[in-house]
Amino acid sequence: MKMDVSVRAAGCSDDLSSGEADVDPKLLELTADEEKCRSIRRQYRQLMYCVRQNREDIVSSANNSLTEALEEANVLFDGVSRTREAALDARFLVMASDLGKEKAKQLNSDMNFFNQLAFCDFLFLFVGLNWMEGDPDKLSDCDDSIALSFWKAIEKEATSWMVKAETFHFVFGSFKLERSAPKPRLEHQKKVRKMEENGNMPTKLQKLDLSSYPEATEKNVERILGLLQTYFRKYPDTPVSYFEFVIDPNSFSRTVENIFYVSFIVRDGFARIRLDEDRLPILEPMNVNQMGEGNDSSCHGRKQGVISLTLQEWKNIVAAFEISEAMITYSSY
């Protein structure tokens, strides 16, 4: 909403040039939010300025100035809703982390110092041998009973702090660098001998004559080609749907085999695959003239047509085309 506002010189009131109009509540809300954000930014800048001015006191002294500054920043962060204020909060956190790092470096810690003499004196006092502090020469006069009582007292106190004794890790094997030769296994030979003794050996194949068996792929391709040519002779002007010809609704594996065999028929030029008006693949016969057209982009010629087909796609095609019976049967195979 766009308004023309004229301010009087006296500053008493604002008059709208377009006449009397009500101020949009959303505009008032945006103005109030802007004032609130401006106040938060001002307080962040004042807080960072105070921390910079008192940097040496915060680092050197043991007061809680840094903690108080962090608490004040947390209170300010509750009202942060925009990126500008969040950036100021991030800058203050970086400054506070640097100060905390410097204060940590100045801490005096005696954790790494260990006085052996003082520790021994504490042990003597603990077991009740404080009389040794007055005359160190009496150490030479200690008999075995005093030493035994000393170690028993130490053992009793130490075992009370242990839930269980430490386990001993055994080392197995040889320490020699050279590896010993592996022993031969005789299990397989024993099994073969047992099978020979029991007479359970399978019949051995003496000779395989492949000449008496025609190649299965060539045989199936010729049989499917005969089915396709029979259909073309019966319906010379009607191409057959590719999916209806190769899909076997009762067997996914047979469908894959049919696709494989039909690809050889397409490769040898006895049929071709093209898309119909519905963009679905169809099979149609090839005559001599079409087989000779090498420049026709619609003629696939000697190309072998193979498609990928998943089990779910096969189920969808069977349902969509309502295929109930396979055109390629394997009854005589």
UniProtKB/Swiss-Prot annotation:
The keyword Magnesium does not apply. Keywords: Chromosome, Cytoplasm, DNA damage, DNA recombination, DNA repair, Nucleus, Repressor, Telomere, Transcription, Transcription regulation. Highly expressed in testis. GO terms for biological process: chromatin looping; DNA repair; double-strand break repair via homologous recombination; protein sumoylation; regulation of telomere maintenance. Its main location: nucleus. InterPro entries: Nse4/EID (IPR027786), Nse4_C (IPR014854), Nse4_Nse3-bd (IPR029225). Pfam families: Nse4-Nse3_bdg, Nse4_C. One of its GO terms (cellular component) is nucleoplasm. It is found in: Nucleus; Cytoplasm; Chromosome, Telomere. Tissue-specific component of the SMC5-SMC6 complex, a complex involved in repair of DNA double-strand breaks by homologous recombination. The complex may promote sister chromatid homologous recombination by recruiting the SMC1-SMC3 cohesin complex to double-strand breaks. The complex is required for telomere maintenance via recombination and mediates sumoylation of shelterin complex (telosome) components. Acts as a repressor of nuclear receptor-dependent transcription possibly by interfering with CREBBP-dependent coactivation. May function as a coinhibitor of other CREBBP/EP300-dependent transcription factors. Component of the SMC5-SMC6 complex which consists at least of SMC5, SMC6, NSMCE2, NSMCE1, NSMCE4A or EID3 and NSMCE3; EID3 seems to be a testis-specific subunit. NSMCE1, NSMCE4A or EID3 and NSMCE3 probably form a subcomplex that bridges the head domains of the SMC5:SMC6 heterodimer. Homodimer, and heterodimer with EID2. Interacts with the C-terminal region of CREBBP. Belongs to the NSE4 family. This is EP300-interacting inhibitor of differentiation 3.
